[in-house]
Design a protein with these regions (language model features):
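Membrane transport/envelope proteins' first extracytoplasmic loop
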Residues: 3-235
Length: 235
């Protein structure tokens, strides 16, 4: 009896039932689609960050970290890798108004990059620049072009050795005032420690950051860092 009544009701309200079925099917399809897309994005992002050796933790100080302090951090139980790191905005001489996040890591296996085109990274290069591929594309810059970065009145002239992507600069904005990336005017570039040393001489040992790769819990790592370095740092 109830079954017959249900069929009678469905017959009277065919359009409404059909609309309801379509809406349910669409809702399920959209939900499954979003979940699949999110899973794909999550997997691709994780793979990219791992491939570019994205740091798990960053120690930051107002002073500088010495090589001895780096070695102490590297010896902390649970720290897989650690490297001194420096990144600062530098003007681009050839592109008025443009800036690049000039980046140096003492160990490319920590906070390094993925090479899209060009030569492999050379830590001993005194004139090599590895440039953001998106900034290069937006400004018609190719491998082999000359580029001059200016930081604190010091010019660093080099040759674009490669075009790259970097997990450390996945969100590439100039400062807090810039909400969205604008690769026409701002990007990033890696230079080797050798180029940094050549340009700044005795001031080239200024690294205000140590980047760490570790699966250790943050609170435990912070406790060990304070005990080891005995100085104020941010993680």
């Amino acid at each position: 009896m109830l079954f017959k009544k249900l069929w009678r009701t469905m017959g009277l309200y065919k359009a409404q039932f059909l609309s309801m079925i379509i809406m349910i099917a669409l809702g399920i399809g959209i939900f499954v689609g979003f979940n699949m897309e999110w899973y794909s994005i999550d997997q691709n992002t994780s793979s990219f960050l791992k491939e570019t050796n994205f740091a798990d933790y960053r120690l930051i100080t107002d002073e500088k970290f010495s090589k001895d302090e780096l070695e102490k951090v590297q010896k902390i139980d649970g720290v897989e890798k650690a490297a001194r790191y420096f990144s600062v905005n530098a003007d681009v001489k050839e592109q008025e108004g443009d800036s690049l996040a000039m980046t140096i890591t003492e160990d490319e296996s920590v906070s390094g990059f993925y090479l899209v085109e060009g030569a492999d990274y050379d830590p001993e290069s005194e004139n090599g620049i590895w440039l953001s591929d998106k900034y290069a594309a937006a400004n018609n810059i190719s491998v082999g072009d000359s580029l001059t970065l200016i930081y604190k009145d010091t010019e660093l002239s080099g040759i674009v050795q490669g075009l790259i992507k970097s997990g450390e600069h996945m969100i590439c904005v100039r400062d807090e005032s810039q909400l969205m990336p604008d690769f026409k005017t701002y990007g990033f570039a890696y230079i080797a420690p050798a180029m940094y040393n050549k340009a700044f001489h005795r001031h080239s040992d200024f690294y205000e950051q140590i980047n760490i790769i570790s699966s250790k819990d943050q609170s435990d790592l912070l406790k060990d860092v304070y005990t080891t370095l005995e100085k104020a740092v941010l993680v």
